[in-house]
Amino acid sequence: MKLILLAYFAVLSNILSSVEGRVRYSKRPNHKLGTAEYAECMSNAPIVFNRFDASYYTRNLSVVFNILGYSSVDANVTFDIIVEAYGEQRARFTFDPCEINLNTVCPVARDTAITTQGILPVSPQDVQMIPKIAWGIPDFEGLVRFRMYRSEDIAASSIDNSTPLACMIATLNNGHTFKNKVVKALSGTALALSIAGVLGFYVIGMEHSTYLTRQVFINSVPSLQHMGELLQCIAFTGAIGITQPKVLVAWASNFAWILGFITNKEIENSLESFRKHSNGNLSSPKIGGVHRRDAVATNPQSPIPGFYHGFQGLATEVGTLTTNLFTLTLIWFLISLAIAGGIVIIFVLIIKFLRQTRIIAKSSCDYITRYWFRVLFNACMRWVLVCWPVLVTMIIYQFTLREAYGPVILAALLLALLFGLFLWLTIKVIRVITTSGLSNEDNPETLISDPKIYTWWGWLYLDLKERRWLYVYACFAHYFSFALVLALVQQFAKIQTILLFVIEIISFILLAVFRPFVGFKNSFCVFLVALTRVVSFALLIPIAFDLAIIPKVIIAIILIIIQGLVFSFMALWSLWNFITMLGTAWPAISYTVPWLRRLIDEYQRQLHIDFENPAVSASEKLSTEEIIPQESNFEEPSTTKKEGNVDTKEDGNDDVFSLVNASPMRPASTIPSHSCDNGINEMQRTV
């Protein structure tokens, strides 16, 4: 029995000792700080570096470094390494490389390459100088300054009064950052879900009547416009011309793709070739960008790593040059515009195929198939409207660089095209209003419901109230003034942040006073995005002033939390809108989203009232004001002739529908209620 007890205690003691050892081992710190971006901080240096890597490991208390360079002098050298964190010097190491057996620099020889790899031991006292927060905080604000001096100069005076032979500066990275591919994927998914949800409900609304399409579009939010403006706001916060905390630039870079800042090695090589053939200066100090660990050359005029300023800092974080930003934006804008147009064309071809094969009714979606070019025009112009702030901003910013004439010419042509489109649009609408007699102030709603206007220009004011359609010009003025300040005042951070805040305040006040957007949910999204812009640029004002780096980081984190919460809310709302759209469209699921059910019930009720008593006044019908105000009727004065289920004008102008019985529209008796369109006696507004 005693032997059994002794054996039991022996086994138990071994288990406890092994567990204790594992616990002690797991509690040992295993932190790491390593260099990321680097650049030379001295021009015309006798010793130049092509590579500088350094990593500090807390477990073995050592710094491992790797240096590649070239020497043009003979000298005995002394290394000086300074570690800075959050604006303060935390550690300094001055030593003779011969003491740690760095033979290639002991001494350095003229016209020889330097290849040095070494391990520098660190004392526990030096480790205590580095704050513990450095090991876990995202986007650690740290720098390493590496200099080489002549040993004779240091012996004759002091190291601070000596002239270095070489100088490098590199940022420190602890492996934690707000720059994350998951956030990029989530932002792209949220934008795609918002588009898919709106388009899905748009088609569902056409299954019942074109009368419902505008109401459905406004109630299925957030839309492309809402989500696009929010993503642009977050991305632009990283492009303000202030010395920004690294954490804010890293966060903004997740959304830089909405600005067209998407690049890879092949695109960069093509852009460099384009700039080279248009007298581009590759060593211009305005180019921006610094080198990472896989770089093989260093530009002495690049921005100092760790100091992120305006578009240069955002370009560095994205991995491109500032002179390439406009060209990247233009390339991806044209690609996205082609994708939007291709989706519309493919959809029209699918509808035609389904009609030819009689899978759907012969007259289903007649408006889309007959007037596909108007649908295509509305879709493309809606995307141009979303991209307008980005395009104007990058055009004006390209003018400030003046580094190569090729991108400047492209920017000038695009600016002329955009403003030509704006002027043509204004002249066209004014001419239609004048010639059609729609300028009567007693009945401004006819502008909204006139087929000569909204079938072409509905993308401008689709979500605006009838009496507030001119608010779209206030939006253009807002975008243009924002672009001017953001692009032209990059070198005056304090003035820029204050002006941007004033612009957003004025825009928000106009929005609150006029309340131009129709529908509660639509207005809520607009107000939420506008308020986010105001708060974002308000928080950037103190960062523009001479605050210490730690208060700047705290303000930046508060801004990230606010923007992150708003983005998460809008993304979840887009997901819910998409899910409810799928549930409504799926035949096996007998579910209809409540607001759509109310719209359909109201439409059916008004159909019944109009069928029993066509002379009943519209004011006696049940109001749908809680969902969206009714559109006013517009009856074309000319006589019409019936062609199937479509009313066309007898004078041969078949590009305009007559809106007889436009509100509500009676379903055609020969077409089932589940078809895409019930006869199209009413002209729909297209996106």
Curated annotation (Swiss-Prot):
Ranges of Basic and acidic residues composition bias in the record: 638-651
InterPro entries: TRP_C (IPR010308), TRP_Flc/Pkd2-like (IPR040241), TRP_N (IPR032800)
Membrane-topology descriptor: Multi-pass membrane protein
Keyword terms of this UniProt record: Membrane, Signal, Transmembrane, Transmembrane helix, Transport
Transmembrane segments: 186-206, 331-351, 376-396, 407-427, 469-489, 498-518, 524-544, 553-573
Main location: membrane
Gene Ontology terms, MF aspect: transmembrane transporter activity
Signal peptide residues on this chain, from the entry's feature table: 1-21
Region (Disordered): 632-653
Location(s), subcellular: Membrane
Database matches in Pfam families: TRP (PF06011), TRP_N (PF14558)
A GO cellular component annotation in the UniProt record: cell division site
GO BP annotations listed: fungal-type cell wall biogenesis; transmembrane transport
Family of the protein in this entry: Belongs to the transient receptor potential (TRP) ion channel family.
Entry protein name: Uncharacterized membrane protein C663.14c
